[in-house]
Amino acid sequence: MDPRTVQFSRTKLTELMIPSFANFGGKVHGGLILSLMDKVAYAVASKHAGTYCVTVTVDGVEFLQPVEVGELLTLDAAVHYVGNSSLVVGIKVTSENVKTNEVKHTNNSYFTMVAKGEDGKPTKVPELVLEDITEMRRFVDAIKRMKVKKEANAKMQKEHDEFIMVDDMEMLKDQRCKIEFKVDDDFNDLFSDT
């Protein structure tokens, strides 16, 4: 399996945002943009892997600016990282007003994809050839994001496992919620995983 460059699978998708894509507020529906992001992530990952890929996680989707009907939405996607069977695809989304030529950055995100073999099980993907400092930085950034995510997940699991209702109720005092049930000593038993 020969290593592949970032450019080998880099994909740019541009689509006109039509009225049927609008939400109740008249802007392009975020769900449509997410669907397009998933499609372009699949195209990039499958081209690099040379096989069918599935979406495993989507990280950091933030809608920075609204997309208007009539604008051209462009999704620029490339492989940022490869593991054994997984790939991280970085996607930058911009929209362009065709009348004014104004381009605005609307989204970016990272899709983790896993390559599947004929048997439906994860299969090895080609190594990624890093041809410049930007590609190297993106690869390293992906490793750092994975590490931070793993640490955050472990911390949240520990917090969940150590739930102490009396202590954790303090957190709720300034929140927008109401507790409308009787709290008793046996309540913590409801939260144990055993």
Language-model features and meaning:
Residues 12-16:
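Active-site-flanking beta-strand signature of metal-NTP-handling nucleotidyl enzymes
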Residues 21:
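Surface-exposed, Lys/Arg-rich phosphate-binding patches that contact polyanionic backbones
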Residues 32-50, 194:
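Active-site helix/loop of acyl-thioester processing domains in fatty-acid/polyketide metabolism
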Residues 26:
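Anion-recognition interface
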Residues 3:
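Post-transcriptional modification and biogenesis factors for structured RNAs
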Residues 6-11, 69, 80-173, 177-193:
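HotDog/MaoC-like acyl-thioester-processing domains
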Residues 54-64, 72-80, 95:
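Conserved interaction-surface patches within small, structured recognition/assembly domains
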